A protein has these predicted regions:
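Generic structural signal for alpha-helix termini and adjacent loop/cap motifs
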Residues: 4, 8, 36-40, 96, ...
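Polyanion-binding surface elements
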Residues: 54, 62-65
Length: 116
């Protein structure tokens, strides 16, 4: 989406855009890894994400708004086998590592869109 928006082109969505994804800022991932390395927890697994599901359509609309463009996404046929729902359960990381994501999707999008 970012490349298309930088070229002032509509983002392309495959399917209806109802697919749910869990987006997280790389700084939050790094902080979670540092917490895990510095913890006393051994031989455990953690899901690291925002814990918030966002549809692809919603993501595209957020990015368009931040870009201040007057465009709409283009819809193309869905990709066979595409996962409909993917959202992390981060309770284990919250409880064992005392970790929470700090950067919202909107903040992260503003950062990357305004940076590039």
């Amino acid at each position: 989406f970012l490349r298309q928006l930088k070229e002032k082109k509509s983002p392309i969505i495959f399917g209806k855009g109802s697919q749910i994804r869990d987006f997280i800022h790389v700084e939050d991932v790094a902080k979670a890894n540092i917490r895990a390395m510095n913890s006393d927890v051994e031989n455990d697994f953690f899901n690291i994400g925002s814990g918030v599901g966002t549809s692809i359509l919603e993501l595209s609309k957020m990015m368009i708004k931040i870009s201040k463009l007057q465009i709409e996404p283009i819809f193309k046929p869905e990709i066979k086998g595409d996962i409909e729902f993917s959202k992390s359960s981060i309770d284990h990381a919250k409880n064992k590592l005392n970790w929470n994501p700090e950067i919202s999707l909107n903040e992260g999008l503003k950062e990357i869109i305004n940076k590039n």
